[in-house]
Amino acid sequence: MNMQSNAPTGSTAPLNERFTLVLLAHDQSTALRRALRHYRDSSFAMLVIDSSSLINADITVEFPSVQYLHAPTAIGFGDKVRQAVERVATPYLAIADAESFLLPQALDQSLRFLEAHAEYGACQGYSLAFEAHADRVDYYLLDRKGCEDYSGASAEARLAVFAEDCPSLVSALTRTETLRRSYASLPVGFDSRLQEAGHCLGLVTDAKVRLLDIPYGVHERSRVAKPRNPVGTAPGTEDLRAVAEQERMSTMLADAFGAAASAREHVRAILKKLVERSVPQTGKVLESTWDSRRGEPVRRFESTQYVELPFYNQAFFDVLASLEFLLHAAPSGQVQLKELEAVMLQQKELSRPQRNTNAEPLDEQLARAFLSYAFNQDLVKQLLEVMQAKGDKRYVQMLQAWEQRLKAAAFENTARLFDATRSGQLLRWLEAREPSASETQKVSKYLAARNGGPTFGILILDLDADIFKMQATFDSVINGYCRAFKIVVFTTGDLPAETTPQSVLHFVKVNESNYVDKINQVVSQSDCDWMVMAEAGDELTPSGLFRAGVELLAAPQCQAVAMDEFQRQPDGTLADVFRPGFNLDLLQSTPALMARHWLVRRETLVKLGGYSREFKNAMEFDLLLRLVEQDGLGGLAHLDEPLLICQAPAVEDNADERKTLLRHLAVRGYQADVSAVVPGTHKIDYRFAERPLVSIIVHGIGDLTALQRCLLSVLQRTRYQRYEVLVPTGAANHSVLRTWLDGQGHQASRVRLLDIGPGVATGSWINAASQEAKGDYLVTLVADSEVLNVNWIESLLNQALRPEVGVVGAKLVERDGRITQAGLILGLNDEVGSAFIGEPKTARGYMNRLVVEQNCSAVSFACLMISKQLFNAADGIDSELFDDALGDVDLCLRVGQAGYLTVWTPHVQVIQSGVLASTPEARAALREKWSEALAQDRFYNGNLALQGAGFTLGPVRNVPWTDLLV
């Protein structure tokens, strides 16, 4: 519907009949409400065009004068503007993103200019870009001083001048009819950045444009800044497809606006400048940090300033102060929200009362938290109550005034934002693990009846002599439920007290050269049952040791137990590390994530000779490897419970890890090589001398063309020379395939066509082919796949030749590298499935699990290697139960039951859909035969979700404390 304005055009008419501000939104609920709050005292008309998938129905309730249009199909900028110009009834309008703030006074001045100058079609002032952070707002140069009056008599003349500066006119106040004419000619189907550029060109082409020497607005930086490099584009190169689109757009614009030949170059140049418009870091103008004590910002100006711009006056800075209050009270930017997650995590931790009498008083903790971010209403309320109880009248008055100001803003409590973050979810999940008062009493009584349960020696390394970090660790231990512990601190600082090894808290003076010996000495003299290493600043969870004390009573065979942990990331947020059951290959591949903070039986630690001085930066990893060398894998276990919150390890190569891994592999008889494909991880080349014959069994043939692609990929991309390919053929396609193979050169002689009757299922065919196979190792390869890397057979053999390994599987990908299968997880989405589906080829995955070799419960027949001897010993595929589907899962589980490992390797990549064959009968048979394994995959942590994409946080649930007491 094309609405023509019947409103008076003179300045005497009400403002809402003369001018409409159009806000464009897409999944920006908080920013939209914040913007509407900014404009609430203005009397102009407002229209919201919201392309979010879900309607924001509350907008018109909260802001009754606002017209709201839900337009989920209007994704692009131009689509939204077209919706707007159809509905706006006023003669003038301006367009702004929901993240932007236009200044009402500037809009009024621009409107008055256009009303007084009929020959002009658009008017605006100068704007800044902003980037909101947790504690500050940074402002960046956006518009530069240049021509302010594009008043050429012709479009060509205006374009020639406009090409010099190219200010963005996206938010300019314009005549509604000007935009209607322009959008009648503008091409569609381009991305939003090109549409915005076309919008600006249309205004300059249609009429004169004026820039007033006034502050006009501030725009969120990421909405107006072009990324440094498009995704997938290397630095210094151009996205050729984007360049082609830009050229196509410039041609269409020139045609649409009837530009003369001489003006076409101007159109091209302007479009290029507008599209490439960016806000470089060097354009930062000022930094405005919120002072929580004063309730206002404190500004710091950069050394380079642009005093020719109209921003340097108190009135504008007062406006910025009001906007900054809104930005902090209703945060929405990605950078800001991520930083606030870390800040509010710290606030959450500081707001907890401490049991430790030596801890920092609660009022001081809360006051410190308030200074970091004053807009957390829960924190303000708690601090106010504490200060009222303390009787600090001056502080109370300040807090009461601030609380009223926050309430008057009427935004959602920012504390709820934290609840939705990963850190907030993890803390809430962790709190649910704590026992109730009655459960605590029952568990304590249970342990007391068993000599108090196991005792834990907590070995804390304090090589930086950081008393604040030490205090955090002490507080966490005291706040826990476990009381069967002794703490030994190995510090390079001055000893705070004289203690003895019998003390609950014992300090030992160490230096860089002797701390390992001192640790070993303490361990040998300790009367604790279990030892655990930690660093100053690590915080034990309230219930981790408490649960371990109960569980370990029932596990006398355990020598060492891994638990889970939360890690503080470099940005201050939390990430979970939910480890699998003992996973030898994952331990070897990524020890920084797998080898830390194990509970080790003290007598085992002593028997192994303690920690090694030779590998100081990999002490725990080296100890575990020596334990494997001495006792195998039987005494190693895992408990699905977070033990502590610690600093995330640095993502870097560790020479000590590599050295002890090489030492360990040599003990196991391998002359191996260890490299780091990804920093912080290890890739082991076992360097086997054997070159066994490999039989590749192609199965699942449906389409002859797909089969030919599969065979070509094997014949052309396989570097390994000792292999054969077995292909089933029926009478119908045998001669066709043989003729095709005859034309493929001498490599095709490796392919053997085996006659097989129609309708033979996958399981039966693989069983039959295995009997015809001449190779010592079998590879199943589905016929619609293509191998990618030339060393794929060598990489499979690198694992399969290990005596402890039974089955090896590959990484399945789309043609663009996206993951389709990365090992199989039992019970995922109520069946058997893969995690990481759809992840890009550059993804590292949860705990690096997309880039390192690891053990898993099963891999699929899409690409699977097993020795022929083991395949026969396992009686092949169970064709009675799993002939059509899930025979691969059943085979892997039977091989695992026999004591062999299944290894998934990312170093073999195969193009294939990754869809696992499944039938109701096969699923039922698998559930009946392997119910225990399906109930909990031992290589998938029980705290992780079994629904969805995998490796996400599972539901919040309590520990069944009473059930543990058996």
Language-model features: locations:
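Short aromatic/hydrophobic "clamp" motif used to bind/position activated sugar donors
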Residues: 93, 531, 778
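Glycine-rich, basic loop-to-helix element that forms the pyrophosphate-binding segment
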Residues: 71-88, 510-526, 756-773
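Short, acidic, metal-binding catalytic loop of nucleotide-sugar glycosyltransferases
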Residues: 36-45, 474-484, 712-722
